[in-house]
């Protein structure tokens, strides 16, 4: 057995992956608490902006909840939320989208055909430059001023203000305004928890962007007014945003999400600040698009595979933006920054391949490692738990079932979901058989009508007998098929109930990773 085969054998078990996952996965109760307050804050803020500013009220269309939290790739507490406020400007459906800088586009209006509002309105008439391009700096400046003015800090010379819910005169929480890039960040605090909300104005489009590798889907895409400091006409360039497409890609390949979260956890523990979350996700987009991700492998082996892909990207100094290969996301990183992370990463990969039990010392902080040891010591004093058998590779995990229930539940949910889909497909096939039999009977009936009438005694009544025989056969077949359909529908109901029972004990991401919708 060569070295590669030995390493693969060592990486079959997901025991260490499961241990680390305890410190990565968001808990359902905690997530619900943050999400509840965030939803109320969102409703309140949008309501205030619409009430205070006529331009926003007229051109605001809806809200897009974005970011790693809604992609289910978030690590740690849900303390950051992205809130994209979609604006629908006059004549936006007839604009020309032109190529801008790599990763960016320009929005060109035909000044001969645009509505008079662009020249007559005291706000909008400032947003187009002399060439008819929408100026992202001007729109962003309006947005920032509008937010500051509308939210109206409770005290002078303060960026803090109170947020009220619709149904109460008591403050829901307090928020503070901070500026960061194209976003306006609100630091929300209700006394028991704190999180950040990035407010970003975005424009929505349904026409195809000027990108060669773009495959049109049903969902729209967006442009964001990201500020640029240098280069030609920076205010004409708008950053692409394909959030719906990226979310769908991850949804179709659910097994990648925990691996993305583990790499983000490694980054946080190792303090690799140069490795943005979006860079990690982009690496996965490239691998998924090439079908290089074998989801039948253990998560540990897939994790090591993706760490090696990350190392390759660092060595080449190249990580292309998935939607525009001319844009290198690593372009602004220095060689010293890249080399330092790459050397450390290569050492970690080598150590894990040699001994997977070393994973915890790289992925977990000292405090988390200590907590894990306490958990393991406590388990030693308790009655022996059932050992979780990893059905994907036939090996028993050395990690007790009590700590692998999340993974096991996901497997059960996926299996029951697959059973449900199989039953649905069987029902579909049976119904198609019924339709086929009906069509066959109809064709036979038509053929009888088209035959010349034979008046000889020998053949008289033969066609009627054949039709009755076929009709009887059809009736019996339909009865049997209906019985089968009923049996399968009962089986689906039972499967739904089993999934519901499993989910009632699951964490937020245990459910969401499977892609199985919550059942009422």
Swiss-Prot record:
Q: Where does Mg(2+) bind?
A: 80, 82, 198
According to its UniProt record, the EC number is 2.7.7.86
- Cofactor section: Mg(2+); Mn(2+)
Supply the enzyme class, top level: transferase
Q: Which reaction does it catalyse?
A: GTP + ATP = 2',3'-cGAMP + 2 diphosphate; GTP + ATP = pppGp(2'-5')A + diphosphate; pppGp(2'-5')A = 2',3'-cGAMP + diphosphate
Q: One short Pfam family name for this protein?
A: Mab-21
Leader sequence range is none
Q: Where does Mn(2+) bind?
A: 288, 294
Q: Which UniProt keywords apply?
A: ATP-binding, GTP-binding, Immunity, Innate immunity, Magnesium, Manganese, Metal-binding, Nucleotide-binding, Nucleotidyltransferase, RNA-binding, Transferase
UniProt GO MF annotations:
2',3'-cyclic GMP-AMP synthase activity; ATP binding; double-stranded DNA binding; GTP binding; metal ion binding; RNA binding
The biological process GO terms on file are: innate immune response
Per UniProt, GTP binds at 198
**Amino acids binding ATP:** 68, 80-82, 264
> Which PANTHER family does the annotation name?
CELL FATE DETERMINING PROTEIN MAB21-RELATED, CYCLIC GMP-AMP SYNTHASE-LIKE PROTEIN-RELATED
* Role of this protein: Nucleotidyltransferase that catalyzes the formation of cyclic GMP-AMP (2',3'-cGAMP) from ATP and GTP and plays a key role in innate immunity. Acts as a key sensor of double-stranded RNA (dsRNA), the presence of dsRNA in the cytoplasm being a danger signal that triggers the immune responses. Directly binds dsRNA, activating the nucleotidyltransferase activity, leading to synthesis of 2',3'-cGAMP, a second messenger that binds to and activates Sting, thereby triggering the immune response via activation of the NF-kappa-B transcription factor.
The UniProt similarity line reads: Belongs to the mab-21 family.
Official protein name in the record: Cyclic GMP-AMP synthase-like receptor
């Amino acid at each position: 057995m060569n070295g590669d085969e030995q390493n693969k054998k060592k990486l079959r078990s997901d025991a260490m992956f499961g241990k680390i996952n305890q410190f990565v996965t968001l808990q359902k109760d905690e997530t619900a608490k943050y999400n509840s307050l965030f939803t109320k804050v969102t409703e309140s803020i949008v309501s205030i902006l619409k009430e205070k500013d006529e331009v926003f009220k007229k051109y605001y269309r809806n809200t897009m909840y974005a970011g790693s939290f809604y992609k289910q790739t978030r690590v740690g507490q849900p303390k950051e939320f992205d809130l994209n406020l979609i604006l629908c400007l006059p004549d936006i459906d007839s604009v020309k989208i032109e190529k801008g800088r790599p990763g960016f586009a320009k929005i060109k209006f035909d000044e001969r055909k645009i509505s008079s509002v662009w020249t007559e309105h005291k706000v909008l008439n400032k947003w187009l430059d002399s060439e008819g391009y929408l100026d992202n700096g001007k729109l962003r400046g309006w947005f920032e001023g509008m937010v500051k003015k509308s939210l109206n800090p409770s005290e002078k010379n303060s960026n803090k203000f109170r947020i009220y819910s619709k149904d109460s005169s008591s403050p829901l929480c307090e928020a503070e305004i901070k500026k960061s890039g194209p976003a306006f960040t609100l630091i929300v605090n209700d006394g028991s928890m704190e999180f950040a909300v990035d407010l970003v104005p975005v424009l929505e489009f349904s026409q195809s962007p000027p990108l060669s590798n773009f495959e049109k889907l049903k969902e729209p895409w967006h442009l964001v007014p990201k500020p640029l400091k240098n280069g030609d006409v920076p205010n004409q360039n708008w950053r692409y945003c394909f959030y719906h497409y990226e979310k769908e890609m991850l949804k179709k390949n659910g097994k990648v999400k925990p691996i993305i979260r583990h790499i983000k956890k490694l980054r946080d523990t190792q303090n690799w600040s140069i490795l943005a979350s979006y860079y990690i996700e982009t690496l996965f987009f490239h691998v998924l698009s090439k079908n290089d991700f074998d989801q039948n492998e253990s998560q540990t082996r897939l994790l090591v595979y993706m760490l090696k892909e990350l190392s390759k990207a660092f060595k080449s100094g190249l990580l292309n933006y998935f939607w525009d290969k001319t844009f290198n996301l690593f372009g602004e990183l220095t060689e010293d920054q890249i080399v330092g992370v790459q050397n450390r990463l290569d050492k970690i990969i080598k150590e894990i391949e040699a001994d997977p039990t070393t994973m915890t010392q790289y992925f977990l902080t000292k405090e988390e490692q200590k907590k894990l040891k306490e958990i393991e010591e406590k388990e030693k004093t308790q009655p022996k738990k059932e050992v979780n058998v990893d059905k994907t590779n036939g090996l028993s995990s050395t990690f007790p079932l009590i700590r692998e229930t999340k993974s096991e539940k996901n497997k059960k949910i996926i299996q029951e979901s697959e059973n449900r889909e199989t039953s649905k497909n069987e029902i579909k096939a049976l119904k198609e058989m019924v339709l086929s039999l009906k069509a066959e009977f109809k064709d036979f009936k038509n053929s009888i009508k088209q035959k010349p009438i034979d008046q000889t005694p020998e053949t008289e009544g033969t066609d009627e007998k054949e039709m009755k025989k076929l009709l009887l056969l059809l009736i019996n077949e339909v009865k049997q098929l209906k019985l089968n359909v009923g049996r399968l529908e009962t089986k689906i109901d039972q499967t739904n109930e089993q999934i519901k029972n499993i989910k009632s004990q699951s964490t937020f991401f245990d459910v969401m990773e499977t892609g199985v919708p919550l059942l009422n």
